[in-house]
């Protein structure tokens, strides 16, 4: 069982648009939603599921709107919330910004979309590429003329239109890895993981098939343990265009890509990561007078790689003043509104070590610092480099017209949640 009705409300709880799918819940029930929401908010007991009598309200907030689904029976809550977020995504793709004004300006098309998105309370067509084939924003109505069945009915590829043409056929593939790291004050790595994704920008004519091969080191989490140097990917998620049956058989990533930009796959490695940029800090607080920092930054990756736009964010006391800085490289800036100093290094080659000193005055009367000190955080980007060692061995482009296409592959490693605690 799914939703009985779906509403879009403004911030005051006024109904902007609604669709009754099952007729088993009185449409005026939604009038109870906002009073219950405000009451729960005041009590500090706000929940994504609210109830009045036998009716459940499942809701999300987006910009200045509430999207609410009602149900009287046992609904599959995860399905309903997934549907509400999908509604936001589809509306945003149609109207750029989903807010009260765009709802008021597009009543006709929204009713058409709600009719296609859900049928008798069950999600139906939620792929915006399919919806855009026969619901156009320009006419605010269904396309007229000779009736044409949706691509899904004809077994065509729903995420790619036919007849696409480019003068220059190109594919850009980015392997992007974000490093999440937490280091304790005594230098122990408490948490480390790599979150990766393969993103593509496709400008290819016709209906091409692409085959992507990754290096032999890469294993997927259900292949069993391999050699000690292998890279075992976890939580692998593919775009819907990937032929999963082919992948299950021989690990070939084969697909007909959507046109333009999309994420082909994402993955995670819960593994010990050697900190790429290591920070050592010595902080000396002289009572009632000053605080001094000595920060050493060391790049722990190969010399042939370089980290770009490195930013080291060092927290300082709220009442610090009169800053003085000295550094062997880059620039240092005090950001008092964030209670931090930012050491910026435009280019940080591998195997290098740099030093920065900072001096702040402190007021003669100071409050006892009972709260824990915020950690040092680091931002960086290393091109032509992956922490996991994942590499693209080949990217084949096959199209019946036989045109030549240029594949471009790029690797980027960047910071995720990268923090080092201080003494």
UniProtKB/Swiss-Prot annotation:
Modifications made to the protein after synthesis: Phosphorylation of membrane-bound AP1M1/AP1M2 increases its affinity for sorting signals.
Topology term for the membrane: Peripheral membrane protein
Compartment(s) where it occurs, according to its Swiss-Prot or TrEMBL record: Golgi apparatus; Cytoplasmic vesicle, Clathrin-coated vesicle membrane
SUPFAM superfamilies: Second domain of Mu2 adaptin subunit (ap50) of ap2 adaptor (SSF49447), SNARE-like (SSF64356)
Cross-referenced InterPro entries: Adaptor_comp_med_subunit, AP2_Mu_C_sf, AP_mu_sigma_su, Clathrin_mu, Clathrin_mu_CS, Longin-like_dom_sf, MHD
Gene3D superfamilies xref list: 3.30.450.60, Mu homology domain, subdomain B
GO cellular component, one term: specific granule membrane
GO molecular function: clathrin adaptor activity
Domain (MHD) ranges: 168-421
Keywords, in A-Z order: Acetylation, Cytoplasmic vesicle, Golgi apparatus, Host-virus interaction, Membrane, Phosphoprotein, Protein transport, Transport
Modified residues (N-acetylserine): 2
Entry's Gene Ontology BP terms: endosome to melanosome transport; intracellular protein transport; melanosome assembly; melanosome organization; platelet dense granule organization; vesicle-mediated transport
Main subcellular localisation: Golgi
Modified residues (Phosphothreonine): 152, 154, 223
PANTHER family per record: AP COMPLEX SUBUNIT MU
Subunit: Adaptor protein complex 1 (AP-1) is a heterotetramer composed of two large adaptins (gamma-type subunit AP1G1 and beta-type subunit AP1B1), a medium adaptin (mu-type subunit AP1M1 or AP1M2) and a small adaptin (sigma-type subunit AP1S1 or AP1S2 or AP1S3). Interacts with MARCHF11. Associates with the AP1(MU)-Nef-MHC-I complex; this complex is required for MHC-I internalization. (Microbial infection) Interacts with HIV-1 Nef.
Family indicated by similarity: Belongs to the adaptor complexes medium subunit family.
Function: Subunit of clathrin-associated adaptor protein complex 1 that plays a role in protein sorting in the trans-Golgi network (TGN) and endosomes. The AP complexes mediate the recruitment of clathrin to membranes and the recognition of sorting signals within the cytosolic tails of transmembrane cargo molecules.
Protein name: AP-1 complex subunit mu-1
